[in-house]
Amino acid sequence: KNLQNEKKAKEYLGKIQSSSNLLLMIINQILEMARIESGTAVLQLKAEDIDALFHRVNTVFEEDIRKKNLQYHADLDVRHHYVVCDQTKLQEIMLNIISNAIKYTPEGHSIHVKVHEAVSENPSRIRYIFSCEDTGIGMSEEYLPHVYEEFSREHTTTENKVPGTGLGLSIIKSMIELMGGSIQVESRQGIGTKFTVDFSFDIASKEEVYGNQ
């Protein structure tokens, strides 16, 4: 009966598509975690332009930022712009952390994303510090020790309304460690959250990224 109503039919199809996308995401996350835990995950390293990568990451969320009227600031402050990294995994790490900030930051609030270069003890390598700080709902002191556990989510009224599996940060932490990096989180409930990731990469040249064009 309801299928005769076009609006209702579109609503049902939308729910089916959302459920299918969520299921596919869960399957992919479980497979990725299995690869990491079994030691079969490998890094696909190549020369990359960090300016271009950072721009791609930030443009992904333009529509979500507009819809929630968020004050979104993205800053890149590096001297070395070309590095050897796993582009896909580095993007996924940034996308996941920024996506969480957007999901848990109320309308009209702010998010500040930054990549800056830190001092490296190895002259052939550079350190990038990626940070994402929001004025969102934050996390309780009791939950923070469990933030990277598989299938872990804080049970609050707001948290329960946001779709997710609780696998994301667990996988992201494993990816970061696979890349030789580290991640830290600071959070206060009702005030906001800040994730900080410390990466180290081999330095590349512009020619390695773009050839002789």
PLM region spans:
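Short helix-loop "hinge" at the ATP-lid/N-box region of the Bergerat-fold HATPase_c
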Residues: 101-102
